[in-house]
Amino acid sequence: MVTFRQDVTALRKYTNRNSLSFYYAMVYLCTRAINEVPAFRLTCRDGALFTVDRRDPSFTDLPAGSEAFKIITLPAGDDLAAFCRAAGEKSRAQTVFIDQKAEAGELIYYSCLPWVDLTALTNEGDHGPDDTVPRISWGRYTEQGGRLTLGLSVEVNHRFIDGLHIGQFANRLNAAIRALENEG
């Protein structure tokens, strides 16, 4: 597990300007960055290693006024705003904790703790040696020197993904967020 500070200033400004969910936008950008790093697309089936075309996000979502979250899973697609709209629609329409049919693909698990400034997070569970599902979590963003940052935790199976790959993910995520400074 690796945790690092992620500057999200441009993302927060972008989501505010475009009336988008910061959370859904962060899920989308992390998913896009992960899918750009081939090592994150490795999966193990029946003892054999494969590279999948993409991983889809599967993320916790807490409906307004509720203390019972649900798991939302859907393809990220190619458009940030479209993903945010689709995620919101799916969350409103989904009445069960988890849609088992949507969980059948190659996934990335996401969680967010917006109530605390995250310094590290380890997901519970007994992950087997062939578990290749990346787990991404982040906490509340805080302001320092006019910039918003948050602690972002990346939990992976070290048999398949190394620090080099986490660095590649972080660089791609940074680039995607910085690119929003010049958009909408």
PLM features per residue range, with description:
Residues 30, 84-91, 169-177:
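Short amphipathic C-terminal alpha-helix that caps PH/PH-like domains
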